[in-house]
C-alpha cells in the first residue's frame, strides 16, 4: 500500500523513502509486532471466555498437565498481523506477493478448521482429509508459480550469465550446480511446502519452541530474498536473480514481527498456544518463500529442527509397527529430551541455539562454494 504512494508520487522526497526495501521491511516488522501485541491480549480474553482451551494428551510428560486450560488458536492473530502488515508495506501489485499471502491464508484456513472441529466435535479433521487439503493448495500454489515465473537468471562467472527455467533446483555448496527437474519439480515443491508446514506443526509442543524457530527461519530467508531480488548482489554471489523476490523480504519481516509479538504471550509459562491455524500457516509461508527464491534445498538446513521433529515421529511410528519397539522415549523429539530429564526451558533454549547455528551455516553457503 505504502509502495503505491511512491509510485504515484515518485518525485516527492517524503514518499521516496517507501521505495527502499530495507525501510519497508523494518516498517512491516514493527507494524506486525505491534498488531500482534495489541490483538494478543484481546484474543486471549476472547478465547478464554469462549472456552477455546488446549486439551493435553494423557500420555504426555507430567509437567504438561499444568498447561491444561491454556487458550489455543492464538495463531489467528499472528495471521491477521502478517496479512495486514504485508498488505500495508509490500508492493501489492506483485503477483508473487499475492500468491504467497493467499497460500499462507489457505493453510491458516485448514488449521482453523482443524482447531474448530476439535472444540465442536472433540476431534479434529481426519489426518487424511487435512493432508489432502494441504496437497491440493500446495499443487495449486506451485502451478501458479510455474505459470507466473518464467525462470531465473544466475551468474556463472564475472562475465557470463545463464537463464534457467523455474523448475530448476540450485544445489548449495557447488558452483554452477543447477538441475532442471521439469515436471518432477511439481511433486518436489509440493513435498517441500507440505513438509515445512507439518514440520512446524509437530514442533509446536513446548512454550516458545516453534515460534522462536520460525523467527530464525524467517530472518534467514529475509537475507536470501533480499539478495535474490537485487541484480548486483545476486550476480556477485552467483545466486538466482528473481526480480520480485525482494518484496518477499518485506513479507517475511511481517512474519518475524508477528511471531515476536506472539512470543510475548507464548513464552514460558505460555498464556496462549498458536494451534494448527498458526503452525500450518507459518510453515507454509516459509516453504513458499524458499521455493520462490530458489533455496528449496537449504530449507532442510534452515528448518533443521522441523525436519528432526518430523523424522522423529516417522521413525517412532515405523519402528513400533515393524519391531513393536520405540526408538525415542516419546515423539516428537522435544518430548524425548523432556523425559530424559531436561527442563522445558532448557529444551527450548537449546533447540533455539541449534536453529541459530543452522541458520548461520545456511547463510555461509552464499560464499562457500
Where are these predicted regions, by residue range?
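Membrane interface segments of multi-pass transport proteins and intramembrane proteases
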Residues: 118-127, 173-178
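Divalent metal-coordination and catalytic microenvironments
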Residues: 74, 115, 276
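Juxtamembrane helix-capping/reentrant segments at transmembrane boundaries
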Residues: 57-70, 122-130, 134, 334, ...
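Membrane-interfacial helix termini and the short, flexible loops that connect transmembrane helices
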Residues: 47, 116-124, 270-271
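Alpha-helical transmembrane segments
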Residues: 2-44, 80-109, 135-136, 141, ...
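Membrane-interface helix-loop junction between the first two transmembrane segments
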Residues: 38-59
Amino acid at each position: 500500500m505504502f509502495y503505491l504512494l511512491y509510485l504515484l508520487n515518485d518525485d516527492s522526497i517524503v514518499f521516496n523513502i517507501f521505495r527502499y526495501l530495507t525501510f519497508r521491511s523494518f516498517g512491516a516488522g514493527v507494524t506486525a509486532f505491534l498488531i500482534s501485541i495489541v490483538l494478543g491480549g484481546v484474543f486471549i480474553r476472547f478465547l478464554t471466555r469462549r472456552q477455546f482451551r488446549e486439551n493435553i494428551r494423557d500420555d504426555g510428560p507430567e509437567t504438561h498437565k499444568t498447561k491444561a486450560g491454556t487458550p489455543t488458536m492464538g495463531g489467528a492473530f499472528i495471521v491477521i498481523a502478517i496479512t495486514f502488515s504485508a498488505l500495508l508495506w509490500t508492493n501489492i501489485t506483485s503477483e508473487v506477493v499475492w500468491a504467497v499471502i493467499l497460500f499462507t491464508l489457505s493453510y491458516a484456513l485448514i488449521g482453523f478448521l482443524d482447531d474448530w472441529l476439535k472444540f465442536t466435535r472433540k476431534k479434529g479433521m481426519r489426518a487424511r482429509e487435512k493432508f489432502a487439503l494441504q496437497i491440493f493448495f500446495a499443487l495449486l500454489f506451485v502451478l501458479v508459480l510455474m505459470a507466473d515465473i518464467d525462470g531465473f537468471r544466475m551468474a556463472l562467472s564475472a562475465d557470463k550469465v545463464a537463464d534457467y527455467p523455474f523448475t530448476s533446483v540450485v544445489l548449495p555448496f557447488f558452483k554452477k550446480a543447477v538441475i532442471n527437474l521439469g515436471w518432477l519439480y511439481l511433486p518436489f515443491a509440493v513435498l517441500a511446502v507440505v513438509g515445512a508446514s507439518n514440520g512446524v506443526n509437530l514442533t509446536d509442543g513446548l512454550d516458545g519452541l516453534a515460534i522462536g524457530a520460525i523467527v530464525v527461519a524467517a530472518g534467514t530467508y529475509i537475507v536470501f530474498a533480499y539478495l535474490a531480488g537485487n541484480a548486483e548482489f545476486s550476480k556477485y554471489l552467483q545466486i538466482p536473480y528473481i526480480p520480485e523476490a525482494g518484496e518477499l523480504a518485506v513479507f517475511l519481516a511481517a512474519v518475524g514481527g508477528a511471531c515476536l509479538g506472539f512470543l510475548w504471550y507464548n513464552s514460558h509459562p505460555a498464556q496462549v498456544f498458536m494451534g494448527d491455524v498458526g503452525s500450518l500457516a507459518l510453515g507454509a509461508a516459509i516453504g513458499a518463500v524458499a521455493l520462490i527464491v530458489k533455496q528449496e534445498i537449504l530449507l532442510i538446513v534452515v528448518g533443521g529442527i522441523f525436519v528432526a521433529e518430523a523424522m522423529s515421529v516417522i521413525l517412532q511410528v515405523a519402528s513400533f509397527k515393524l519391531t513393536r519397539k520405540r526408538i525415542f522415549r516419546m515423539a516428537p523429539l522435544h518430548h524425548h529430551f523432556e523425559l530424559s530429564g531436561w527442563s522445558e526451558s532448557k529444551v527450548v533454549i537449546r533447540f533455539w541455539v541449534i536453529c541459530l547455528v543452522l541458520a548461520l551455516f545456511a547463510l555461509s553457503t552464499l560464499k562457500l562454494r
